[in-house]
């Protein structure tokens, strides 16, 4: 007797394309993404063209020369978690475009959470998180971030207040 079976294999390329389509649609309609564009002085058209891809990287997401790169592991996370990283990296993407070819070596030596570019991106990310997942979860995320970077004492309280405040 011959038995024929099939297994449903995940089509990772199709999964990525589906997620990218959903991300693009969300960006075009998200009020935080639109706010970032407005406050950074760039048209909302940027949301339709910002390059985004999935790749195998160590961190959850990063931006290189304005290209947003998301860790493939985010495909397994809830969409609002994926989008909070997209919002953070969108800020960096615009920063890259606006500062094209400028390099500030002074800032390279700053602690990660002391860099103005990171503070700005995290503020938008936390605002997105608060609106989409609730203020409590946004605050927990900030606490976890401060734990991860081993920030303690008065510096921790100051950084927490800074990150939970609205972006300038």
Describe the residue ranges of each PLM region:
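Short, conserved alpha-helix that lines the donor NDP-sugar binding/gating region
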Residues: 122
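Zn2+-dependent metallopeptidase catalytic core
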Residues: 16-44
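Short active-site segment of divalent metal-dependent hydrolases/proteases
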Residues: 87-95
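Active-site scaffold of zinc-dependent metalloenzymes
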Residues: 49-80
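Glutamine-centric residue-chemistry signal
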Residues: 95-96, 125
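Post-HEXXH active-site segment of zinc metalloproteases
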Residues: 80-84, 96-119
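Proteolytic processing junctions in secreted/extracellular precursors
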Residues: 2-8
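Long, well-structured alpha-helical subdomains associated
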Residues: 80, 112-114, 125-168
């Amino acid at each position: 007797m011959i038995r024929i079976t099939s297994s449903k294999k995940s089509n990772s390329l199709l999964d990525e394309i589906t997620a990218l389509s959903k991300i693009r649609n969300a960006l075009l309609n998200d009020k935080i993404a639109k706010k970032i564009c407005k406050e950074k002085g760039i048209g909302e058209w940027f949301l339709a063209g910002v390059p985004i891809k999935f790749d195998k990287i160590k961190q959850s997401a990063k931006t290189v020369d304005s290209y947003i790169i998301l860790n493939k592991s985010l495909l397994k996370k809830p969409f609002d978690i994926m989008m909070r990283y997209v919002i953070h990296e969108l800020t960096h993407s615009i920063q890259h475009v606006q500062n094209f070819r400028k390099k500030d070596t002074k800032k390279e030596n700053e602690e990660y959470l002391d860099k103005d570019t990171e503070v700005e991106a995290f503020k938008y990310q936390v605002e997105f998180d608060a609106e989409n997942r609730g203020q409590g979860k946004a605050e927990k995320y900030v606490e976890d971030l401060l734990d991860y970077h081993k920030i303690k004492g008065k510096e921790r309280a100051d950084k927490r207040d800074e990150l939970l405040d609205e972006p300038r």
